[in-house]
Structure formats: C-alpha cells, structure tokens
C-alpha cells in the first residue's frame, strides 16, 4: 500500500472558506435531522387510520398542532441556549 497523499497547507482565505462551507453543511444536516424527527413524531402520533389519499379532519388538525408544538419547542430551546451563551 502506498502512503496517503498529503494535503497541501491552505492559506487563511481557503481555510475560512472551507470552515464556512462545513458550517453550512452541518446546519443543513441538522435541519434535515429535525425535519426527519418532526415527520416521524407527528406521523406516529397523528396518523391512526389506514393510508389514504387524504388525511381525516382529526388527523390534519393533529398534524398541524404537532408541527406547531415542535416548532415552538425548538425555538424555545434555541432561545434558552442563546441566553446561556450570553451569560458566559
């Protein structure tokens, strides 16, 4: 086996660009994970009947409430974390 190819040292501008790109990709991944969690939680909680082309009235209302509560709790958590960061 040959030795791994060394990565040339990056200049500061390239490092910052790479760091910014990685932060954006991590944010996208976190958003996707939140959407997956939201979908899974609300689906399992609200969809009680069989699969059909339309949600029942109660399922639609449950889904709407579930999404609202999920978003409310997510925003609350973010605000609490930001408040804790400011106290440090």
Swiss-Prot record:
Disulfide bonds: 42-66, 46-62
Compartment annotation: Mitochondrion inner membrane
Membrane topology: Peripheral membrane protein
Record's keyword annotation contains Ligase: no
Keywords per UniProt: Chaperone, Disulfide bond, Membrane, Metal-binding, Mitochondrion, Mitochondrion inner membrane, Protein transport, Translocation, Transport, Zinc
InterPro entries linked to this entry: Tim10-like (IPR004217), Tim10-like_dom_sf (IPR035427)
Gene Ontology CC annotation, any one: mitochondrial inner membrane
Principal subcellular localisation of the protein: mitochondrion
Twin CX3C motif (motif): residue ranges: 42-66
Listed Gene3D superfamilies: Mitochondrial import inner membrane translocase subunit tim13 like domains
A GO BP entry: protein transport
Pfam hit, one: zf-Tim10_DDP
Purpose of the protein: Mitochondrial intermembrane chaperone that participates in the import and insertion of some multi-pass transmembrane proteins into the mitochondrial inner membrane. Also required for the transfer of beta-barrel precursors from the TOM complex to the sorting and assembly machinery (SAM complex) of the outer membrane. Acts as a chaperone-like protein that protects the hydrophobic precursors from aggregation and guide them through the mitochondrial intermembrane space.
Similarity field: Belongs to the small Tim family.
Protein name: Mitochondrial import inner membrane translocase subunit TIM8
Lineage of the organism: Eukaryota, Fungi, Dikarya, Basidiomycota, Agaricomycotina
């Amino acid at each position: 086996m040959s030795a791994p190819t060394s990565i040339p040292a990056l200049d500061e501008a390239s490092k910052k660009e790479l760091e910014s790109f990685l932060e954006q990709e991590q944010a996208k991944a976190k958003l996707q994970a939140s959407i997956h969690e939201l979908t899974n939680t609300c689906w399992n909680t609200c969809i009680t009947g069989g699969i059909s082309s339309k949600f029942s009235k109660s399922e639609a209302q449950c889904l709407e409430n579930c999404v609202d509560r999920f978003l409310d709790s997510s925003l609350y958590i973010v605000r609490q974390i930001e408040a804790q960061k400011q106290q440090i």
